[in-house]
Amino acid sequence: MSLPHLSLADARNLHLAAQGLLNKPRRRASLEDIPATISRMSLLQIDTINIVARSPYLVLFSRLGNYPAQWLDESLARGELMEYWAHEACFMPRSDFRLIRHRMLAPEKMGWKYKDAWMQEHEAEIAQLIQHIHDKGPVRSADFEHPRKGASGWWEWKPHKRHLEGLFTAGKVMVIERRNFQRVYDLTHRVMPDWDDERDLVSQTEAEIIMLDNSARSLGIFREQWLADYYRLKRPALAAWREARAEQQQIIAVHVEKLGNLWLHDDLLPLLERALAGKLTATHSAVLSPFDPVVWDRKRAEQLFDFSYRLECYTPAPKRQYGYFVLPLLHRGQLVGRMDAKMHRQTGILEVISLWLQEGIKPTTTLQKGLRQAITDFANWQQATRVTLGCCPQGLFTDCRTGWEIDPVA
């Protein structure tokens, strides 16, 4: 039996459909959409850079449109979500606690995220900290005074911050909420009172099978080699997983133009029929975060979208090719470009410092309309009243070369 043959555009559209980025939202977002959208992606990576809206809020905005950013914080505080190390530090459904509990119980395998020597050296102080949380309730690292005021850099964290990070990685405490994006910790047994390790623990092998299932569903269409990166799995049993899921017809083989044979998750079978009939169309234009699942695996983004991306915020300014915090631009199924932007919150201006189009992308009327609306929506969501434009490709935004005002109801 011959494999279904898909164009590269169809493969991209199927992936974007799995990620919730194929079409513009048809309705106003609701509070319930926050955990639902994170479940769809499986993971929502956390990053603290706030040159524009912080990444987790932006990833949700790209899919949901205009929504109150505090909804993510509320979803965490209500216990619908949890934080832990997955792809990197991530929000995930709290029901997935079982998938990462084995990591908590072996923190010494977590590399730089857990320093056993530090935890042993400060054992008595850490025991006092645990007792303090037990007696006084949840804490932030900011609740404790730094003994070396003026120190800076992650390697000079105040001791209680390092203690809490270690306890977090070891699963002794969990994040129950964020206040001004600062973590608030409580003891794990109070956050998960019904959990019992002896009764409920899932083995690493079993957990990784479910992680591979989640990765396949969230990617929608994939090469086998793309799966492990989603949860940062080191040596998953990929061959056995693939054979089992193919036999169960939970994944099916397809042939994709330029990419060869890929796998398709069975959740996308209805869309596969539309793609084969030439009826699967991408209509969404959006500003993406550098930590969006669509681009967080740089090799996958290059293979699937022909989009080479590198985060340059840690690169010295003179050596940057594009800018400090460059945002990929999605338009109708393609990653058509990127922009270096900064939100000036005091003046209400979204500054587009520079914008670049991918090689071969023409500044058509449709492209200009889509990108202008995407940038306008992005600015409006951040309460901007104006967009200013710096360097742009020739022929793009010729009728508003220096920028435009924001209509609050746009």
Swiss-Prot record:
GO MF assignments: DNA N-glycosylase activity
EC numbers: 3.2.2.-
Consequence of gene disruption: Deletion of the gene slightly increases cellular sensitivity to the cross-linking agent mechlorethamine. It does not affect sensitivity to the methylating agent methylmethanesulfonate (MMS).
Induction info: Constitutively expressed. Not induced by DNA damaging agents.
Family affiliation: Belongs to the DNA glycosylase AlkZ-like family.
PANTHER family for this protein: CYTOPLASMIC PROTEIN
Record's protein name: Interstrand DNA cross-link repair glycosylase
Organism, as annotated: Escherichia coli (strain K12)
Encoding gene, per UniProt annotation: ycaQ
